[in-house]
From Swiss-Prot:
GO MF term set: efflux transmembrane transporter activity
Domain of life, per lineage: Bacteria
Family named by the database record: Belongs to the major facilitator superfamily.
Keywords noted in UniProt: Cell membrane, Membrane, Transmembrane, Transmembrane helix, Transport
Lineage: Bacteria, Bacillati, Bacillota, Bacilli, Bacillales
Location (main, coarse): membrane
Species assigned in the record: Bacillus subtilis (strain 168)
GO biological process: response to antibiotic
UniProt protein name: Uncharacterized MFS-type transporter YfmI
Gene that encodes it: yfmI
Membrane topology recorded in Swiss-Prot or TrEMBL: Multi-pass membrane protein
Length: 406
């Protein structure tokens, strides 16, 4: 792997670790300040909305700036905004302070929405197609490991250091991420291709048009959208409700369930990294296997009440999810070109987060009126529908067309 790849790997790790701490700090601070669960929970919704906006306008930036420079600028601005947030946390409570905190959160989320599509586009440009499965597998393994550490130990870190010093730790993590990008990322390579000089409107629309113009890409995106509706099952409030109401366990088991899922994801990413050569030439097959496995396990999980069996199922869900997710990511990187990749990644990120936002809003009603068990059952059905659709479009039609050609 190139030096630029390890720069992205280190940057993603420190950024996501920092933002797991940042999210917990902000939610904890707002809850203590207002004693309102509703206001604290608004952090997630506002973050998603502004990440959508950030991803949507990213093509306007990348027609003028190289991808490495864009990702460096986004990290620098987020670091400066975190410094502003640190000073906001020191202020005494007032409505003005509350508004200021939410403005800073919105701005941070806007620029944070650039990171994922930029990362995927840069990996697609600096890594050759025959090594992308391995590259994405290692990225996922390291990322899941440090997110697990962040979310597991975040509460202890905040309790020990306090909100202010935890934000300082987050700023330090983003600073190290920025240094890695500055000194290791090959600024002259990525985004070196000649791009069409489109108008701002065309630059934004082109990504959305590309999403549905190529058959394989269109199928993967539609699968993505269906799966996004099912993504709400791992929202903290939903998984905690399932543990309490269905498994009849407390918060400790909620931690075990979350830990098992992250552990499974780490194992899945490591397996894909080690066996990348076997996956590389059969991406569609393994994507569909992962989709069917994840959907089936989720559906079964929705019907059970045994906590130990639930733990085992969640442990296996992790590798199934990672298998589906990494093969989808690699397929998109392989299908797209350097001229279109960032526009497609930006449009995809915006669309998936938009659907996910609505699934969050819908999940409360489903859970309250029909019960949290049905949430997981319906999610499992949606995931299987996505897998069946993918099989019908990518495998069945291919076999039919081959048969007709003879």
């Amino acid at each position: 792997m190139s030096k630029g790849y390890y720069s992205i790997l280190f940057s993603q790790t420190t950024t996501n670790l920092g933002f797991s701490l940042y999210t917990m700090v902000v939610i904890s601070f707002l809850f203590k300040m207002t004693n309102s669960t509703t206001i604290a929970s608004m952090v997630t919704l506002i973050s998603i909305i502004f990440r959508i906006f950030g991803s949507a306008i990213l093509p306007l930036i990348t027609i003028r700036l190289k991808l490495p420079l864009t990702i460096i600028i986004s990290q620098l601005i987020q670091m400066l905004l975190l410094i502003c947030l640190f000073y906001a946390l020191l202020r005494t409570y007032s409505n003005q302070t509350l508004i200021l905190v939410f403005i800073i959160i919105s701005c941070i989320s806007f620029f944070n929405g650039w990171f994922s599509p930029l990362k995927s586009a840069i990996i697609g440009e600096i890594i050759s197609p025959d090594r992308r499965v391995k590259a994405n597998g290692l990225l996922s393994t390291v990322d899941q490991t440090f997110q697990f550490v962040g979310w597991s130990l975040g509460g202890l870190i905040i309790a020990f250091l306090g909100e202010g010093y935890t934000i300082i730790l987050t700023i330090f993590l983003l600073f190290t991420s920025l240094l890695s990008l500055l000194f290791c990322l090959p600024h002259g390579h990525a985004n070196s291709v000649i791009r069409e000089k489109n108008s701002p409107n065309k630059s934004i629309v082109s990504g959305w048009r590309y999403l549905f113009s190529q058959k394989k890409l269109r199928t993967i995106i539609i699968m993505d959208l269906i799966e996004s509706w099912a993504g709400m099952i791992w929202i903290g409030s939903v998984s905690l409700a399932f543990v309490n109401e269905v498994l009849h366990k407390g918060e400790s088991w909620w931690g075990f369930i979350n830990g098992a899922y992250y552990l499974g994801s780490m194992i899945g990413g490591f397996i894909i990294y080690k066996l990348s050569e076997r996956f590389q030439n059969k991406l569609i097959n393994f994507m569909l296997i992962g989709a069917v496995s994840y959907g089936s396990l989720t559906l079964i999980y929705g019907f059970i009440s045994n906590s130990y069996l639930a733990l085992i199922l969640v442990l296996f869900m992790g590798p199934a999810y990672i298998l589906r997710d990494l093969t989808q990511e690699t397929l998109i990187q392989n299908i797209t070109t350097e001229q279109t990749r960032i526009n497609i990644m930006s449009a995809r990120s915006s669309l998936v987060q938009f659907i996910f936002m609505f699934s969050i809003l819908a999940i409360g009603a489903i859970s309250d009126f029909l019960g949290v068990r049905l949430v997981y059952v319906s999610a499992g059905i949606l995931l299987l529908v996505s897998a069946i659709y993918g099989f019908s479009q990518l495998q069945f039609k291919k076999k039919v067309n081959k048969h007709i050609s003879f």
